[in-house]
Amino acid sequence: MSRQSRSRFPSPTLITKSEDLAALCTTLRREPYVTIDTEFMRERTYWPELCVVQLGGADCVAVIDTLAPELDLAPVGELLADPAVIKVFHACRQDIEIFLLRFGSIPQPMFDTQVAAMVAGFGDQVGYDTLVSSLTGGHIDKAHRFSDWSRRPLSQAQIDYAAADVTHLRGVYETLRDRLEKEGRLAWVSEEMAVLNDPATYRTDPVTMWERLRPRTNNRRYLGLLRAICAWREVEAQRLNIPRQRLIKDESLLEIAATSPADAESLAQARGVGRGFAEGRSGATLLAAIAEARGLPDADLPAIPRSRESGARPSPALVSLLKVLLAAKSEQHNVAPKLLASSEDLDRLATEAEPDVPALTGWRRDVFGQDALALKNGEICLGVDGKQIKLITTG
């Protein structure tokens, strides 16, 4: 838990009964904010299996055994939906995905200390233990980070580990919130949270899964087959509730798209595909998807976006200049470079007149994007004054 005295924090309570959970959530709904974390298992399944929810209040911390028989989690859903209570997470994306699946909605309002830390200049995706140490002087014991949280009973060491995540988070949140409020940057955090508040962020569209494999050809017939095969895998993995790579690996999908097998015997020849798979239900539905894609008219086939084609590659020199500008702006404003602009943002800035990228919206445009466009268009250039990068107006 912490090198500091455990008396700093309330002793964790293990919740296994519905009446205790209801009472806890009633108490927490009277507070201005609550810190939240989850422990789950996903190594053997497509859908995450929620095993533990941790809730931290001013005077209480609870570890909720979500696998306890007949435990009614409805009070947790009501707490998450309460607009009067800020829900505080660190690196919340997977937690929110789980709550969206379980309760059908995204917690509101919420605050992610990982996002806030990047806005406050702690670097790209700073680790939680680093934040705890820097902002509170505490220490996170990592011994149980890879525990099997589905096994019961939970040990006292697991309970203490789970509770520590939300107890330390209170100090992290309060320090970051106060710092960003003083610097006038809380609105920046709110802009970032808009993405995490959008249900579309957590949806997986089977039809677009092929793009993750980043194929190097623009043969549209091949891409049509790859799109169909990847979509099939996503739907089948969901149906079987197994990880997509356990069902069939990416390399196998690429090979199947190239060979376009028409029967089980041909499918079984593909790397990583056995005869049992090819002749079973999964093999039959995969072959049906391939056959359907093979019959698509040319107009319905996908293509790689033009910005990724060889003829639209960005100028390495211009991208390098944009990276220098990004580093300078990041240092000037004490904000993580990755939060200002991604590598894809820089590539598109270098190849498109005014691309639709995050770097050109909201506070990012004010801090970096507008000058990036000016640099690309020759309206400013970069100079060096001692150890500082300077922007020089041309003309």
Swiss-Prot record:
Cofactor entry: a divalent metal cation
3'-5' exonuclease domain: residues covered: 14-181
Subcellular location(s) per record: Cytoplasm
A GO MF label: ribonuclease D activity
Gene3D superfamilies (alphabetical): HRDC domain, Ribonuclease H-like superfamily/Ribonuclease H
PROSITE patterns: HRDC (PS50967)
GO CC terms, sorted: cytoplasm
Biological process, per Gene Ontology: tRNA 3'-end processing
Chief location: cytoplasm
Cleaved signal peptide residues: none
Swiss-Prot/TrEMBL keywords: Cytoplasm, Exonuclease, Hydrolase, Nuclease, tRNA processing
Domain HRDC as annotated: residue spans: 219-300
EC number assigned by the record: 3.1.13.5
Catalytic function, reaction form: Exonucleolytic cleavage that removes extra residues from the 3'-terminus of tRNA to produce 5'-mononucleotides
Superkingdom of origin organism: Bacteria
InterPro entries associated with the record: 3'-5'_exonuclease_dom (IPR002562), HRDC-like_sf (IPR010997), HRDC_dom (IPR002121), HRDC_dom_sf (IPR044876), RNase_D (IPR006292), RNase_D-like (IPR051086), RNaseH-like_sf (IPR012337), RNaseH_sf (IPR036397)
Function, in words: Exonuclease involved in the 3' processing of various precursor tRNAs. Initiates hydrolysis at the 3'-terminus of an RNA molecule and releases 5'-mononucleotides.
NCBIfam families on file: rnd (TIGR01388)
Family classification: Belongs to the RNase D family.
Protein name: Ribonuclease D
